[in-house]
From Swiss-Prot:
This is Digeranylgeranylglyceryl phosphate synthase. Belongs to the UbiA prenyltransferase family. DGGGP synthase subfamily. It comes from Natronomonas pharaonis (strain ATCC 35678 / DSM 2160 / CIP 103997 / JCM 8858 / NBRC 14720 / NCIMB 2260 / Gabara) (Halobacterium pharaonis). It catalyses: sn-3-O-(geranylgeranyl)glycerol 1-phosphate + (2E,6E,10E)-geranylgeranyl diphosphate = 2,3-bis-O-(geranylgeranyl)-sn-glycerol 1-phosphate + diphosphate. Pathway: Membrane lipid metabolism; glycerophospholipid metabolism. One of its GO terms (biological process) is glycerophospholipid biosynthetic process. Prenyltransferase that catalyzes the transfer of the geranylgeranyl moiety of geranylgeranyl diphosphate (GGPP) to the C2 hydroxyl of (S)-3-O-geranylgeranylglyceryl phosphate (GGGP). This reaction is the second ether-bond-formation step in the biosynthesis of archaeal membrane lipids. The chain crosses the membrane at residues 13-33, 40-60, 89-109, 143-163, 199-219, 220-240, 256-276. One of its GO terms (molecular function) is geranylgeranylglycerol-phosphate geranylgeranyltransferase activity. It holds the Pfam family UbiA. The keyword Disulfide bond does not apply. Its EC number is 2.5.1.42. It is found in: Cell membrane.
C-alpha cells in the first residue's frame, strides 16, 4: 500500500491535474468546445506528461530532496529510483500516443516540451535562471498546446502564454530563494545563490511587471470585451500582492503567485465566454 501511495505522490496529482486544467483553458480560449475529442486527448496527455515529468524530476532530485523534502517517496523508500524512472517512461509513452492523434502543431509543441523537460531535469535545473526559464516556458506552453490541439485562433492564447510564462518565471525564482539552503548544500548555482536573494526577488518582480503589462492586450486588440478586464483586475492585484509578500515570506509569496496566475487564466475563459455568449 505504501508503494501505491508513493507512486501517486510522485505524480504530484494536484499539480498534474492543474496542468491539465491549463490545457483545457488554452483549448477553450482558442476554439470553445468545437473539438471535444481533441480537447480531451490533449488534457489527458498533459496530465500524464506532467505526472511523468514530476516523477523523473524526483528521480534526478533524490539527493536534494533528502535534504529539502525527506518525506518525498524516493528519500523515504516508498519507491526505488529505478521504479520511479520506469514509471515516468510508461506515463510519457501513453501521453505520446494520445498526442499523435492531434494536429501537427500540437505534436510539434509536445515534442519541443519533451526535449525541454528532459533537458531541465538532467542538465539545466541547477544553472542560474536557465532552469527557471525552461519551467516558465513549459507552464505557459500548456495553453499553446491546448489551443493547437483544437486548431483554433491562437492570438489570445499567445498572450496567455506570455502572461503565464512571466508569472511562472517569477514564482520559480521565489521558490529558489525559499530552497536556497538545500540547493547550496547540493552545490547548485541557482539565481539566488549567484546574485543574492534580494536581487533575485527584484528580478522576479520585473517579470511580474511584464506579465501585468501584457495582460490587457486581448482587450486592446479587440479579442475580448470589458468583462475580461473586470475579472482580470483582481488577478493582477493578487500578482502585485504576491510579489510584495515574497520579499518577507517567499513561501507564502510563491503560493500567492501560483493562485493569481490561475485567476488570470480564468479571466481569459470568462473573456472567451462573453464573446461566444
Amino acid at each position: 500500500m505504501e508503494r501505491v501511495r508513493g507512486l501517486v505522490e510522485l505524480l504530484r496529482p494536484g499539480n498534474a491535474v492543474a496542468a491539465g486544467g491549463l490545457t483545457f483553458i488554452g483549448a477553450f480560449v482558442a476554439g470553445g468546445l468545437s473539438s471535444p475529442q481533441s480537447m480531451a486527448f490533449a488534457v489527458v496527455a498533459t496530465v500524464l506528461a506532467t505526472g511523468a515529468g514530476n516523477a523523473i524530476n524526483d528521480y534526478f532530485d533524490r539527493d536534494i530532496d533528502a535534504i529539502n523534502e525527506p518525506d518525498r517517496p524516493i528519500p523515504r523508500g516508498a519507491v526505488s529510483p529505478r521504479g520511479a524512472l520506469v514509471y515516468s517512461v510508461a506515463l510519457f509513452a501513453v501521453a505520446v500516443v494520445l498526442t499523435l492523434l492531434l494536429p501537427w502543431l500540437a505534436i510539434a509543441i509536445a515534442a519541443i516540451n519533451l526535449v525541454a523537460l528532459v533537458a531541465y531535469t538532467e542538465v539545466f535545473k541547477g544553472l542560474p535562471g536557465v532552469g527557471n526559464a525552461l519551467v516558465a516556458y513549459l507552464t505557459g506552453s500548456t495553453f499553446l498546446y491546448g489551443g493547437a490541439a483544437v486548431g483554433g485562433d491562437l492570438a489570445a492564447v499567445v498572450v496567455l502564454f506570455a502572461l503565464a510564462a512571466c508569472a511562472t518565471m517569477a514564482r520559480e525564482i521565489v521558490k529558489d530563494v525559499e530552497d536556497i539552503d538545500g540547493d547550496r548544500a547540493e552545490g547548485l548555482r541557482t539565481l539566488p545563490i549567484v546574485i543574492g536573494e534580494r536581487r533575485s526577488l527584484y528580478v522576479a518582480a520585473g517579470f511580474v511587471v511584464v506579465a501585468v503589462l501584457s495582460s490587457p492586450l486581448p482587450y486592446l486588440l479587440g479579442l475580448f470585451g470589458w468583462v475580461y478586464l473586470v475579472v482580470l483586475v483582481p488577478a493582477l492585484c493578487g500578482l502585485a500582492a504576491a510579489t510584495w509578500r515574497s520579499f518577507s515570506d517567499p513561501t507564502t509569496g510563491q503560493a500567492w503567485l501560483k493562485a493569481s496566475m490561475f485567476a488570470a487564466a480564468v479571466a481569459f475563459v470568462i473573456g472567451r465566454l462573453a464573446v461566444v455568449a
